[in-house]
A protein has these predicted regions:
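Glycine-rich N-terminal segment of FAD-binding domains in flavoprotein oxidoreductases
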Residues: 2-64
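Glycine-/small-residue-rich beta-strand-loop submotif within the FAD-binding core of flavoenzymes
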Residues: 5-6, 49-86, 123-124, 190
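Conserved glycine-rich FAD pyrophosphate-binding loop
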Residues: 8, 47-56, 60-62, 273-427
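General beta-strand structural signal in soluble alpha/beta enzymes
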Residues: 15-16, 36-40, 47, 59-61, ...
Length: 427
């Protein structure tokens, strides 16, 4: 279980099958002062399922894999942490629904784990990060808790469809399954499958142009998915062997609808905007065959780590949130062969920015130093690390001491013995 981001392995693994067993595991860990690291699946971007300390016990939640409720009318489902995207997809598809998939996270990943870890979802620009409604689980001190409607006694079966207005406290439990407790059930949102889908491409000659174009298109509120990729990332996304015929940057726009006329109307609107931007909205990308179909396939069924790496090579993403000016300054810090993805958040006020480092296996020690050097420069430039990795956690704390002092005071109140995800920063 070691990786680029962690040198630690758990001393053993336990596999609870219900919340009572989770509760007993947590109570025992408190008595023994043993650190716990919950694992819903080992498929997230920076290996945050791995321990950050020695002698931790991995709590493997994969056997808690029940879909306890599916509400097709209100488009939500109540699931346990072991439910994977592949498992949830089948009953959803039968009802004309789909899950909100995450960048780089394959179908064998845990839905709940992915959402709790705040993996970047392709649907964020359209739907924003409200993929979970309510949740329940076991706190770090061994007490059972619930948020929103799950904390209430309700007779109506669709009680999880009311939205998030009563579940704001649930946001504290995002970004790390297990830091404040282990979530054993959660209501997640689903979306309707649209029969008509169209992918458009807008070529850009540099990163500054790409962020400007992203801002313009996201302001129309028409794209269901929108992101920009440099030619390295784009070639891998499309299964191309080289980058010669690809532009330096490509903005990818996906529109969805229920009638061809609806898509045609959106195309006219987006085409007019493309002309204002002195560019072209294309349905093809150079000589690449079926580029649009490949994009739709990746969004519905993300490839994961293997998209960027082959035998003998490694891939280390740098997960950040940054403004357009910060992104322009940061781009020069990465080697020319680095891949990079940018997705607009908050109507383009900031962006999910994921550049990466490529390396040959055996070079991890050297590349880790490069990673830390780049992270330090990004922090000095004001770039945010929403989910710090085990490698750069100390750096992030050093640049935000008062913020993490507050977060640790919250954690101490719920986890006085500091047994849950010790040394991890996500809350």
């Amino acid at each position: 279980m070691t990786s680029f981001f962690s040198d630690y392995q758990p001393q053993k693994t336990v596999q609870p099958t219900c919340y009572e067993e989770v509760q007993e595991t947590i109570k025992k860990a408190n008595r023994d002062r043993t650190p716990l690291v919950p694992v819903s699946s080992g498929t997230n971007l920076q290996d945050t399922h791995l321990p950050s300390v020695k002698d931790a016990i991995a709590v493997d939640l994969s056997r808690m894999n029940k879909i306890t409720y599916l509400d097709a009318r209100n488009r939500d489902a109540v699931i346990e942490p072991g439910v994977t995207f592949a498992q949830l997809e089948a009953p959803c598809k039968a009802e004309g629904l789909r899950t909100l998939t995450a960048i780089e996270v394959p179908k064998e990943a845990s839905v709940l784990g992915t959402y709790l870890e705040m993996m970047p979802l392709y649907g964020w620009p359209k739907y924003h990060p409200w993929e979970m409604l309510t949740m329940k689980g076991v706190r770090a001190d061994g007490e059972v808790f619930a948020t929103g409607q799950m904390a209430m006694s309700q007779d109506r079966p669709d009680k999880y469809s009311w939205g998030v207005s009563l579940a704001q406290v649930a946001r504290l439990y995002c970004q790390a399954q297990g830091t404040l407790g282990i979530i054993t059930n959660a209501a997640v949102t689903l979306k309707t499958i649209a029969p008509e889908n169209q992918v458009f491409f807008f070529s850009c000659n540099n990163i500054s142009r790409a962020t400007k174009v992203l801002k313009a298109f996201i302001a129309t509120e028409e794209p269901h998915e929108i992101f920009a990729v440099n030619k390295t990332y784009c070639s891998e996304l499309l299964g191309q062997g080289d980058t010669k015929n690809l532009p330096p940057w490509t903005v990818v726009i996906v529109t969805r609808g229920f009638e061809k006329a609806e898509i045609a109307y959106k195309k006219k609107d987006l085409t007019a905007l493309a002309k204002q931007l002195k560019g072209e909205l294309a349905t093809r990308l150079g000589s690449v065959k079926n580029a649009g179909a490949k994009i739709l396939s990746e969004i519905s069924n993300p490839t994961g780590f293997s998209l960027h790496s082959e035998d003998g090579s490694g891939w280390a993403p740098v997960v950040t949130i940054a403004t357009d000016s910060q992104i322009q300054k940061a781009a020069g810090l990465f080697p020319k062969d680095s891949g990079s993805l940018i997705m607009p958040l908050q109507a383009g006020g900031c962006f999910y920015y994921q550049p990466d480092l490529r390396y040959s296996l055996g070079e991890e020690k050297k590349v880790r130093k490069t990673y830390l050097t780049i992270c330090e420069k990004l922090l000095k430039a004001g770039v945010t690390f929403p989910r710090p990795s085990a490698l750069n956690a100390k750096q992030v704390v050093a640049h935000n001491p008062s913020y993490f002092k507050l977060l640790r005071s919250i954690k101490k109140g719920v986890d006085p013995n500091n047994i849950m995800n010790p040394k991890k920063l996500g809350l």
